[in-house]
Amino acid sequence: MRPVQPAPEVAEALEGGRPVVALESTLISHGLPRPDNLRVARALEEAVRREGAVPATVGVVGGVARVGLGPEELELLASGEVPKLSARDLPAAAATGSSGATTVAATAHLAALCGIKLFATGGLGGVHRGARESWDVSADLAALSRAPVAVVCSGVKSILDVPATLEQLETLGVPVVGFRSRSFAGFYLTDSGCALDWSVEDEGEAAALIRALPGLGLGCGVVISNPLPPEEQLDPSLHERALRSGLEELARRGISGKEVTPFLLEHFRERTGGESLRANERLVVRNARLAARIARRLAAGR
């Protein structure tokens, strides 16, 4: 059995030059609570379809990397009983027949391997606060320096060190552009407070940028920052209070590594009365729609 298997619908779409959008599964397994996670996973696939593209949710089932999951496979990953798998974990999962949800790093790698050019997610991983001591930097960043995939996201998760993350992306040579904005998106917030050098004004410009990468000999991906509209963002003062208390609790409990992001996302959900969860859903659905529209323009060659 091949270690990477696109679903028949995905394989047919790629063979026919039709637009395909990859979706990660860590959002399902660790990013959202049950039963919202499965509902949002289905909503993302439906959002991609409504914009005229084929969704390819990525995950590992029984040691096989599936690019495009069926209903039972989605339910398995939504059960909360599977681990996160980054790109480095894929060989071990394949060798042991394990199942797991793919992070941005693993999803970008597998999408690129199959020839998928667009990938939608909520927020990237990045440089954690205090990384000078912990060296805790997400593998998502290095993966995007190697995988020629455009990732549509709402910046990086606002619990991270956003300026340091942008510096790291620059060091790695990964282009970062805003969609109709010269400010880097702040995940739950419209604006992270970090300026961008470049922006694209529509889906056509975004598609042209993606097409330009291989011709220029750049084998990397690109980050397309798609901010929430101001009226849809989390209240900034509420965000600040939740972040401050979450970081204090994190330090008190000594939580580190892979457990940091799920803990803080759950802390945000509790401290905001579920408002962060609703903002997360809004932003990831918007990103899926935008990625599908860009994929459609890319497939049309214009």
UniProtKB/Swiss-Prot annotation:
Homotrimer. Catalyzes the reversible cleavage of pseudouridine 5'-phosphate (PsiMP) to ribose 5-phosphate and uracil. Functions biologically in the cleavage direction, as part of a pseudouridine degradation pathway. This is Pseudouridine-5'-phosphate glycosidase. Its cofactor is Mn(2+). The active site is at E24, K157. Binds 1 Mn(2+) ion per subunit. Substrate binds at K84, V104, S138, A139, D140. Pfam families: Indigoidine_A.
